[in-house]
């Protein structure tokens, strides 16, 4: 009976340990790297195989964490949008629509110059590229793009309505 007890205990310990190599996957850094790759090379021009090779992450791992290529593209778009500063606070800073819009556009242009001064930064706008791709990107990515663009439009609509109510338009 002593041997059976030890065998059962050993089997329980083995079963409680995960089998295989430990997972050393960093979802955030994978999304950041994929975002830069899609932004640099273009979403349509970048295959899932290229992403896998460039990131040094196996395709099965990418599928496990993102479901499919569309899931990874969608995550990259979300990350890109979250990193772009919209400076929404500038749109209502002074209460004068013209002053606020000028400040907002000035800040956007300053950021553009600053980002393009860094040669390692991709040029262009990943979000607008995805808008232009339309149905060439997956359904989940299209929904992410739509949500991001709608958020920007809503921000401006809210500010313009406030300006109209204040008699500035």
Where are these regions (language model features)?
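Helix-turn-helix
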Residues: 11-12, 29, 33, 37-79
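Short alpha-helical elements of helix-turn-helix
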Residues: 28, 32, 125-130
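Short helix-capping/turn signature of helix-turn-helix
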Residues: 66, 129-137
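Hydrophobic/aromatic residues within well-ordered alpha-helical segments
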Residues: 69, 76-80, 84, 101-108, ...
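Amphipathic alpha-helical packing segments from all-alpha helical-bundle domains
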Residues: 99-103, 122, 137-166
